[in-house]
Amino acid sequence: MSFIILGLSVPVTKSYQKVEEHLFFSHFEHLYRHQQKLAILQQKQRVLDISSTKIVTEGNSLTVPKSITVNYPYRLVIDQMGGNHSLAKIIFDMTDRRFKYQFYLGSGNYQKTSQSLHSP
């Protein structure tokens, strides 16, 4: 009986992990856009500090799920116009995928790309 329960728990755990990862990226993108809006409205720069465990801004934080690895710490500075101060490339690794966020200098825009970590 325990083998059946164990056998069923693995797919549920994997599904939960995928949902958690999807929600994390959705929240990260929302947090970034929200910080841009605040920078413009308050006419002061905003900072996102990204570590292996958290993404922290003034008044907000987002926990990085254990299934996601941040390659190294990043600091994104958003100016009063909502633009970036650097050409940051933030890389998030998971078991099977890598997501890269390439931020464009000055515009506040970014490009998100996904790459499989397994050979075809």
Briefly describe each language-model feature range.
Residues 7, 11-22, 37, 41, ...:
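N-terminal helix-rich module
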Residues 23-36:
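Short extracytoplasmic/periplasmic juxtamembrane "stem" segments immediately C-terminal to an N-terminal membrane anchor
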Residues 1-3:
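N-terminal signal-anchor/signal peptide hydrophobic helix marking the start
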